Amino acid sequence: MLSNSELPDRLRAALQAVDHRWRDVPLEPLRDKGLAHHHVRLVGAGALARVPKQSQLGLSAAANLAYQRACFECASVSGCTPQYLGFLPVSVDLPRGALLVQEVVGRSALLPADLPGIAGSLAALHTLTLPLASARAPLLNAVDPLAALADEIGEQAAHVPAVSLDRSVALTLDRELGRLRRLCSATARPERRFIAFDAHPGNFIVDAQDRAVLVDLEKCRYSYPGLDLAHATLYTSTTWDVDTSASLTVRELLDFYAAWSAATGPLGTGAQAWHVPLRRAMWLWSISWCVKWRALSGLPAMANADGEDWAAERSDTALIAHVRDRVDHYLSPGIVGQLLDEFDALERAFCA
């Protein structure tokens, strides 16, 4: 298991083993902010090394690198994501390998001021030309993305009996999952597009040109843009990262959706009826993930380098304390009720 203190020496050895052109550049570990990766700056190279702690999709170490490479390469055409620069293979020094990507220099997103920029960047992703189905691998491309999402939420919610959870919250989770499954039983679906599926504001850096750059691209897939729009603006997303924390009003949410719709033309017009249903689904995914993390984070780290691993010991203690605080907050009855009220308010506004 890699720690931040070990990273420079391990990364240096991996660079030297392949005689990489950046083998001798200074290496600077960044603050531990995420549960899936360490990040190391290759000083002077304009590059970052993304060193996986785990695969959130449950992939082998090599498959995880290939998946992330595809994410960056597909998204880069949009002009609002970092460029893919290469990879370091799975090795003794880096058991999960590393991806090398362009370093984006800038600041954290400020909400609500940067919401129009985030909407524009997501619109650029969502309006990319959809490749033929045969050319979409290795990215997820479920036969029915809505049903696949409901199944994933169900798998996460299966951890409810193993955790301490307020009964009203458990009942709400079960009721909302039932609502989603009923939606799946109908035939109507929104338009499928390339999406990030991890578009919370903490994953954006605003550069010197005021461009909102989406820098974390490990879970991209072909699914529904409304999931990204929700993940960018849900309370469980906007208050996740301390550097971007904000609570948005219904008016600010409506303005965000309007900005995205204006930038996407017919796609935006057809998507409006799905904004609230997909927002509820993305929130349900988020809080069921919180349940899963609460259940699994106390387990010891896995000995091998493949698959999913939420062990708290893989991350800095300050980061884990922050995540635990957020998980407890989002699973509290008051916050669950607050989100349900927001969904109702948005539904009324969209129908007005």
Residues covered by each model-derived region:
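ATP-binding pocket architecture of kinase catalytic cores
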Residues: L30-E152, R189
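ATP/Mg2+ or Mg2+-diphosphate-binding catalytic cores
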Residues: S288-A352
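Active-site activation/catalytic loop segments of kinase-like enzymes and analogous catalytic loops
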Residues: L229-L267, R280-L299
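A general structural signal marking secondary-structure boundaries and capping sites
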Residues: D19, S76-G79, L88, H126-R136, ...
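Active-site acidic catalytic loop and adjacent metal/ATP-binding pocket
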Residues: L30-V43, L48-A49, L180-L227
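Conserved protein kinase catalytic core
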Residues: Q56, S108, F204, Y222-Y224, ...
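A cross-family kinase active-site recognition segment
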Residues: F87-S91, R107-T172, R182-R193, K219-S223, ...
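An alpha-helical support segment within catalytic cores of ATP-dependent transferases
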Residues: L7-R23, L130-F197, A208-Q209, G265-A271, ...
